[in-house]
Amino acid sequence: MRVYTIGEVLIDFIAKEEGPLNKVTTFEKYPGGAPTNVMVNLSRLGVPSGLISKVGNDPFGKFLLEKLKEENVDVSYVTLDNVHHTGIVFVQLIGASPEFILYRDVAYNYIERKDIDLKVLDDVMLLHFGSVILVQEPSRSTVLYFVEEAKRRGIPISFDVNIRKDLWRENIDEMWKNVEKGLSLADVVKLSEEERNEILEYLGLPKDDFPVLLDEYNIKLLAITRGGKGCKLLLREKSTLKAVGIAPYVVKPVDTTGAGDAFMAAIIAGLYAFDKLNTIDELDIDELEMIGYLQIW
């Protein structure tokens, strides 16, 4: 059994010097894509993991498959696309917060139902996905169909809100529709403090009313990243709300690329370690706090 993700896999071209991309001369390539990063981190934490996606039948696609195999991430369900190229993103470093230029109409945007063998669900102990893969058809419909089928079979679901308004362009209403769909399917949700505030504003609720999100979408575990303030975890057990806030170790940030993905992986790894993937709402406060400390280690 493995934790699987269905979502984007791409090449991160990360600038080797600070400054705008039109001035940068050197980049280094790494495997990327938020859900893919989560699976790599899980594998490094000793949790069996796998990826369901699509890459181009090109050198970059082959590079990704090779690197993921080296990380012991199962790629048996990654298909090759002979029409669309492997996804790429350019990452520019300006201060501690990176900025991204992501290209659309790439292989992972064209995952179709025929690309996925539903037999993989027999080997899934948790299914993870995020909102970026929902930007474009046919991947949107394919992913939602697959997640809904996993949910129907009782497989726990985790969702990374990961709001990227630039990818949705003029379709912001469509973005919110799909973010809400992801929230409604998920048992575990990860979002940033900024994303939490945006969702509450969209719902017409005050910023301090965020526990209502657990009831609004029937979420079992809500994990909120708070940057330099650490993280907050909220768990609903029947009528009882359990919450822990974890302060961070104080460090000087150099590059925050992938930090949220490492956070997401640590949450899943904590649930796996406590054998609570299928009984998330039975976490006690000590276990919840331990999972919180995993995030900032």
Map each language-model feature to its residues.
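Conserved beta-alpha-beta core of the PfkB/ribokinase-like small-molecule kinase fold
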Residues: 135-212, 219, 229-230, 236
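Glycine-rich phosphate/adenosyl-contacting loop at the front of the ribokinase-like
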Residues: 1-74
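Active-site metal-binding loops of divalent metal-dependent hydrolases
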Residues: 9, 132, 161, 262
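Conserved N-terminal subdomain of the carbohydrate kinase-like
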Residues: 48-131
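Conserved phosphate-binding/catalytic region of the ribokinase-like
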Residues: 3, 148, 203-297
